[in-house]
């Protein structure tokens, strides 16, 4: 590079010196020519000046000569700048390698990126872990549902009290006595049930011996309590399953006929019995578990309404 710069500078200087010598020779020639007489008219032709001014005119010309060498001087710096230009270009060359250097770091970041992705990979297994807990909750749910299953048996127990509320039906029985006109209104609705209802009522009269026995079957029904639920829908039909208890009713109806005469007075005591039945049904569900002991209590209860009711209505009569 330095050699090139020197050569360029020498060439510029030599080229500048060449015109300088030519200019000097030309200047010397006009300087020598002015002395002749013919030279005077020539100067005005060249510079439109007289003889004396020409010598001054060439003086400004020589300064014009030197400026050219000054001009080439800036040119030589122009020469070196080109080599200087390539110098910045080589740095441009290295920057590309520098550029790839940042790119390689970009390369490693991708591996860093996959690292977070692998954690993303494991999270999915972590995700399924919470899902498995979701899986077990369903079994936990069924655990609660089983308790829901048993409650139905418990539910049927209160529902059996709902069954006894029909015994609250004795309230319609009082209407059987004097208010038959109003009773029929209820009876038509209970029309179908009366057939089964009386059957239940009959077993209630003899239940002391066998009535409690149908109640124990009510005890097992709790698991089938759902069955009493459908019977609850058509309570009239509910008495129909109790008609299955009807075999005891066969004897019960015989007692009910005697109940027929007492109803006029019997219904009056029975209405008070009507309100208690709701409380009565509660002990009756307890009678379900204690069917054996329950019947003992119920027989006197049922026997009292059977025998004494006749006497009691006789009293009010």
Curated annotation (Swiss-Prot):
<protein>
    <recommendedName>
        <fullName>Proline-rich protein 2</fullName>
    </recommendedName>
</protein>
<feature type="compositionally biased region" description="Low complexity">
    <location>
        <begin position="289"/>
        <end position="305"/>
    </location>
</feature>
<keyword id="KW-0325">Glycoprotein</keyword>
<feature type="region of interest" description="Disordered">
    <location>
        <begin position="15"/>
        <end position="317"/>
    </location>
</feature>
<keyword id="KW-0732">Signal</keyword>
<feature type="signal peptide">
    <location>
        <begin position="1"/>
        <end position="16"/>
    </location>
</feature>
<feature type="compositionally biased region" description="Pro residues">
    <location>
        <begin position="51"/>
        <end position="183"/>
    </location>
</feature>
<feature type="glycosylation site" description="N-linked (GlcNAc...) asparagine">
    <location>
        <position position="46"/>
    </location>
</feature>
<feature type="compositionally biased region" description="Pro residues">
    <location>
        <begin position="32"/>
        <end position="44"/>
    </location>
</feature>
<keyword id="KW-0964">Secreted</keyword>
<feature type="compositionally biased region" description="Pro residues">
    <location>
        <begin position="306"/>
        <end position="317"/>
    </location>
</feature>
<keyword id="KW-0677">Repeat</keyword>
<feature type="compositionally biased region" description="Pro residues">
    <location>
        <begin position="204"/>
        <end position="288"/>
    </location>
</feature>
<dbReference type="GO" id="GO:0005576">
    <property type="term" value="C:extracellular region"/>
</dbReference>
<dbReference type="InterPro" id="IPR026086">
    <property type="entry name" value="Pro-rich"/>
</dbReference>
């Amino acid at each position: 590079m330095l050699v090139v710069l020197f050569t360029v500078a020498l060439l510029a200087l030599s080229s500048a010196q060449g015109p300088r010598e030519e200019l000097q020779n030309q200047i010397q020639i006009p300087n020598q020519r002015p002395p002749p007489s013919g030279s005077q008219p020539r100067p005005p032709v060249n510079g439109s000046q007289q003889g004396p001014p020409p010598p001054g005119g060439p003086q400004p010309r020589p300064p014009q000569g030197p400026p050219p060498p000054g001009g080439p001087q800036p040119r030589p710096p122009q020469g070196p700048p080109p080599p200087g230009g390539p110098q910045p270009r080589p740095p441009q060359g290295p920057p590309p390698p520098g550029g790839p250097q940042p790119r390689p770091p970009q390369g490693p970041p991708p591996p860093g990126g996959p690292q977070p992705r692998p954690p993303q990979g494991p999270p999915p297994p972590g995700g399924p872990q919470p899902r498995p807990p979701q899986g077990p909750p369903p079994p936990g749910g069924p655990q609660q549902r089983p308790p829901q299953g048993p409650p139905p048996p418990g539910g049927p127990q209160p529902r059996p009290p709902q069954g006894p509320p029909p015994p609250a039906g004795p309230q319609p029985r009082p209407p059987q006595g004097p208010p038959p006109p109003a009773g029929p209104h209820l009876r038509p609705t209970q029309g179908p049930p009366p057939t089964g209802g009386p059957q239940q009522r009959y077993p209630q009269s003899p239940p002391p011996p066998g009535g409690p026995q149908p109640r124990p079957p009510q005890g097992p029904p709790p698991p089938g309590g759902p069955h009493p639920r459908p019977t609850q829908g058509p309570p009239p039909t509910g008495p129909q399953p109790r008609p299955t208890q009807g075999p005891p009713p066969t004897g019960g109806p015989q007692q009910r006929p005697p109940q027929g005469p007492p109803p006029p007075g019997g219904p009056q005591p029975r209405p008070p019995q009507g309100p208690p039945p709701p409380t009565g049904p509660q002990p009756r569900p307890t009678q379900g578990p204690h069917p054996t002991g329950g019947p003992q209590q119920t027989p006197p209860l049922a026997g009292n309404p059977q025998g004494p009711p006749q006497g009691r209505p006789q009293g009010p009569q």
